[in-house]
Design a protein with these regions (language model features):
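Alpha/beta-hydrolase active-site loop
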Residues: 23, 43-61
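Gly/Ala-rich beta-loop-alpha elbow adjacent to hydrolase catalytic centers
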Residues: 70-79
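Short, surface-exposed "cap/lid" segments of acyl-processing enzymes
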Residues: 2-44
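Short hydrophobic segments within beta-strands
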Residues: 12-17, 70, 94, 154
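Aromatic pocket-lining residues of Rossmann-like dinucleotide-binding sites
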Residues: 82-83
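Glycine-rich phosphate-binding loop signature in dinucleotide/nucleotide-binding domains
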Residues: 5-6, 60-65, 147, 204
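Short, surface-exposed alpha-helical segments at coil->helix boundaries
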Residues: 21-28, 50, 163-168
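The alpha/beta-hydrolase serine catalytic core
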Residues: 87-169, 173-180, 184-215
Length: 215
């Protein structure tokens, strides 16, 4: 059993698509004795963003005794693609993308195209605002997720990007604790959803880092 000292622990927030690093401020009151830092990554592929996250965590790891990760949506996927397992003490994933290959496959169906077309064109712009990339799909297939960090997952039953079956399979394979909010969306943004999120973090057992024990 270990006791953590004031300000030796960092809450690292990795936002999702369309998010901003400043969203980390929401979590500051939940961890009053921790430093809180939002990572403002500049790239949007797992190989580039993963490298950004790895470099940032590697530097932060020299400054803090423990890093606790909070990652939202694709931010969780990018974080798991970054090779940072050994530097993260605990992870909270909110609406995480845990099977990018399956999501891309679904988007290919939604766009009414085929893998052969995507391979031939390289990139296909869709009507729903996402660019499908053959290089991206190939990278995902060639680099399956490796993740060994103690992780808690919050999932909304009305999430349209990831199915409950997919997130449950991931949780079982990685011994992650899964909490499902009935009626919750992919984006936890309403007052009810935000309160549920905050209560979930409190119940997960790292409410404030000062002099807390963690087994």
């Amino acid at each position: 059993m270990k006791t953590f000292d004031i300000m030796t622990d960092l809450i690292l927030y990795v936002h999702g698509k369309g998010g901003i690093a400043a969203e980390c401020e929401h979590y500051r009151p939940l961890f009053p004795d921790c430093e809180v830092f939002g990572l403002d990554y500049q790239t949007f592929t797992p190989w580039e963003t993963g490298a950004e996250i790895h470099a940032a965590v590697e530097k932060l790891n020299t400054e803090y005794e423990n890093i606790i990760l909070i990652a939202n949506s694709i931010g969780a996927f990018f974080s798991m693609s970054a090779g940072i397992d050994s530097m993260i003490r605990k992870a909270y994933f909110i609406s995480p993308i845990v099977d990018m290959e399956k999501l891309i496959g679904n988007m290919i169906l939604w766009a009414n195209v085929t893998e052969a077309e995507l391979k031939a064109k390289g990139v296909i712009r869709t009507e729903f605002g996402e660019d499908l990339s053959w290089d991206y799909l190939c990278y995902v297939r060639q680099h399956p997720i490796q993740w060994s960090v103690p992780t808690s997952i919050l999932y909304g039953s009305s999430d349209t990007l990831t199915s409950l079956e997919t997130v449950r399979t991931f949780a079982e394979q990685h011994n992650a604790a899964l909490t499902v909010m009935e009626g919750g969306e992919h984006w936890f943004h309403t007052e009810e959803q935000t309160h549920f999120l905050d209560d979930w973090i409190r119940k997960e057992g790292w409410f404030g880092c000062a002099k807390r024990s963690f087994c």
